[in-house]
Amino acid sequence: MNKKVSTVSSYKILAKITDCDGTLVLPSQVTAIKIKISEYLAPDVVVDGYDLYNIGTAGMLSATQTSEDGFEYNFAANPFHDNKPMFPRHGVTYLVELVWYDEDGKPYAGPVYVDTL
């Protein structure tokens, strides 16, 4: 899935998160989020400072169900971390690996491609 984001605003990610049985995981079952950001054309190069950047659930503005099997997560996370932009270059596609931890501490992971404006 591709999401276009501004480098100076909050961002939204549309995600389908299921457990091993295919049951939809609800936003209330998500206790933590970790993301790893790398440039899509150089996937082995992690953007400095963002290996396992944490977004607590307090940084989630909302989670709206957009279909039977997907929620749109709107993060209020500041796009700057330690005074560095989360997505530092305009017009670049980043590969974002999302790791979700449920209420039992079980991790779920999936890729999201982020196109900066």
Question: What do the PLM-derived regions correspond to, one by one?
Answer:
Residues 1-117:
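Contiguous segments within soluble domain cores/interaction surfaces
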